[in-house]
Protein backbone atom coordinates (compact mmCIF):
# COMPACT_ATOMS: atom_id res chain seq x y z
CA UNK A 1 0.00 0.00 0.00
CA UNK A 2 1.32 3.43 -0.89
CA UNK A 3 1.87 6.01 1.83
CA UNK A 4 -0.83 8.26 0.35
CA UNK A 5 -3.44 5.52 0.76
CA UNK A 6 -2.23 4.77 4.29
CA UNK A 7 -2.43 8.50 5.10
CA UNK A 8 -5.98 8.67 3.76
CA UNK A 9 -7.00 5.68 5.89
CA UNK A 10 -5.41 7.37 8.91
CA UNK A 11 -7.42 10.52 8.17
CA UNK A 12 -10.64 8.51 7.88
CA UNK A 13 -9.94 6.65 11.12
CA UNK A 14 -9.03 9.86 12.97
CA UNK A 15 -12.26 11.40 11.71
CA UNK A 16 -14.22 8.35 12.93
CA UNK A 17 -12.48 8.36 16.33
CA UNK A 18 -13.19 12.07 16.84
CA UNK A 19 -16.81 11.73 15.71
CA UNK A 20 -17.57 8.63 17.76
CA UNK A 21 -15.38 9.22 20.80
CA UNK A 22 -13.97 5.71 20.32
CA UNK A 23 -10.41 4.90 21.25
CA UNK A 24 -8.25 4.80 18.10
CA UNK A 25 -6.74 1.43 19.04
CA UNK A 26 -10.20 -0.18 19.31
CA UNK A 27 -11.31 1.41 16.07
CA UNK A 28 -8.17 0.19 14.29
CA UNK A 29 -8.62 -3.34 15.58
CA UNK A 30 -12.19 -3.50 14.26
CA UNK A 31 -11.43 -1.70 11.01
CA UNK A 32 -8.45 -3.88 10.10
CA UNK A 33 -10.10 -7.16 11.00
CA UNK A 34 -9.49 -9.12 7.77
CA UNK A 35 -13.12 -10.14 7.30
CA UNK A 36 -14.40 -6.61 7.91
CA UNK A 37 -11.74 -5.11 5.65
CA UNK A 38 -12.72 -7.45 2.81
CA UNK A 39 -16.29 -6.13 2.96
CA UNK A 40 -14.91 -2.59 2.77
CA UNK A 41 -12.80 -3.53 -0.24
CA UNK A 42 -15.98 -4.30 -2.15
CA UNK A 43 -17.37 -0.86 -1.30
CA UNK A 44 -14.44 1.53 -1.66
CA UNK A 45 -11.38 1.49 -3.87
CA UNK A 46 -9.16 2.81 -1.07
CA UNK A 47 -9.58 -0.52 0.74
CA UNK A 48 -8.86 -2.69 -2.30
CA UNK A 49 -5.45 -3.61 -0.89
CA UNK A 50 -4.96 -4.70 2.72
CA UNK A 51 -2.18 -2.59 4.28
CA UNK A 52 1.23 -4.20 4.68
CA UNK A 53 2.98 -4.18 8.06
CA UNK A 54 4.74 -0.85 7.41
CA UNK A 55 1.49 0.82 6.39
CA UNK A 56 -0.35 -0.57 9.41
CA UNK A 57 2.41 0.67 11.71
CA UNK A 58 2.28 4.13 10.11
CA UNK A 59 -1.53 4.27 10.46
CA UNK A 60 -1.39 3.13 14.10
CA UNK A 61 1.36 5.60 14.94
CA UNK A 62 -0.32 8.55 13.22
CA UNK A 63 -3.80 7.95 14.62
CA UNK A 64 -2.36 7.37 18.09
CA UNK A 65 -0.29 10.56 17.98
CA UNK A 66 -3.27 12.57 16.75
CA UNK A 67 -5.43 11.29 19.61
CA UNK A 68 -2.67 11.77 22.18
CA UNK A 69 -1.86 15.33 21.09
CA UNK A 70 -5.26 16.46 19.84
CA UNK A 71 -5.65 19.43 22.17
CA UNK A 72 -2.23 20.82 21.21
CA UNK A 73 -2.86 20.20 17.50
CA UNK A 74 -6.32 21.79 17.74
CA UNK A 75 -4.74 24.79 19.46
CA UNK A 76 -2.53 25.32 16.41
CA UNK A 77 -5.51 24.97 14.09
CA UNK A 78 -7.49 27.55 16.07
CA UNK A 79 -4.51 29.92 16.12
CA UNK A 80 -3.98 29.80 12.35
CA UNK A 81 -7.63 29.52 11.30
CA UNK A 82 -8.04 33.17 12.16
CA UNK A 83 -11.59 34.01 13.13
CA UNK A 84 -12.78 30.40 12.92
CA UNK A 85 -13.82 28.21 15.83
CA UNK A 86 -13.21 24.48 15.44
CA UNK A 87 -16.97 23.89 15.49
CA UNK A 88 -17.34 25.85 12.24
CA UNK A 89 -14.68 23.89 10.35
CA UNK A 90 -15.72 20.82 8.36
CA UNK A 91 -14.93 17.60 10.17
CA UNK A 92 -13.00 16.26 7.20
CA UNK A 93 -10.92 19.44 6.97
CA UNK A 94 -10.16 19.13 10.68
CA UNK A 95 -9.09 15.51 10.27
CA UNK A 96 -6.85 16.43 7.34
CA UNK A 97 -5.22 19.36 9.19
CA UNK A 98 -4.74 17.28 12.35
CA UNK A 99 -2.96 14.66 10.28
CA UNK A 100 -0.62 17.14 8.58
CA UNK A 101 0.23 19.05 11.75
CA UNK A 102 0.81 15.81 13.62
CA UNK A 103 3.18 14.56 10.93
CA UNK A 104 5.09 17.85 10.97
CA UNK A 105 5.41 17.98 14.76
CA UNK A 106 5.88 14.34 15.72
CA UNK A 107 7.04 12.31 12.72
CA UNK A 108 10.54 13.38 11.80
CA UNK A 109 10.75 11.09 8.78
CA UNK A 110 8.08 13.06 6.92
CA UNK A 111 9.13 16.39 5.38
CA UNK A 112 6.75 19.25 6.15
CA UNK A 113 6.21 20.01 2.45
CA UNK A 114 5.13 16.42 1.84
CA UNK A 115 2.74 16.45 4.81
CA UNK A 116 1.12 19.69 3.62
CA UNK A 117 0.95 18.76 -0.06
CA UNK A 118 -0.54 15.34 0.69
CA UNK A 119 -3.06 16.86 3.10
CA UNK A 120 -4.23 19.41 0.54
CA UNK A 121 -4.42 16.81 -2.24
CA UNK A 122 -6.37 14.37 -0.04
CA UNK A 123 -8.75 17.10 1.11
CA UNK A 124 -9.71 17.62 -2.53
CA UNK A 125 -11.39 14.19 -2.36
CA UNK A 126 -13.71 15.35 0.42
CA UNK A 127 -14.18 19.12 0.49
CA UNK A 128 -15.07 21.91 -1.92
CA UNK A 129 -12.34 24.14 -3.42
CA UNK A 130 -12.91 26.94 -0.89
CA UNK A 131 -12.41 24.55 2.02
CA UNK A 132 -9.31 23.07 0.38
CA UNK A 133 -7.89 26.60 0.01
CA UNK A 134 -8.71 27.24 3.68
CA UNK A 135 -6.88 24.05 4.73
CA UNK A 136 -3.88 25.06 2.63
CA UNK A 137 -3.88 28.54 4.17
CA UNK A 138 -4.08 27.23 7.74
CA UNK A 139 -1.25 24.76 7.16
CA UNK A 140 0.88 27.39 5.41
CA UNK A 141 0.23 29.83 8.26
CA UNK A 142 1.18 27.13 10.76
CA UNK A 143 4.52 26.56 9.00
CA UNK A 144 5.31 30.26 8.69
CA UNK A 145 4.25 30.97 12.27
CA UNK A 146 5.84 28.00 14.03
CA UNK A 147 8.89 27.41 11.84
CA UNK A 148 9.73 30.84 10.36
CA UNK A 149 13.39 30.05 9.73
CA UNK A 150 12.75 26.72 8.03
CA UNK A 151 11.92 26.06 4.42
CA UNK A 152 9.08 23.65 3.77
CA UNK A 153 11.72 21.06 2.80
Describe each region flagged by the PLM.
Residues 1-153:
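N-terminal interaction/assembly modules
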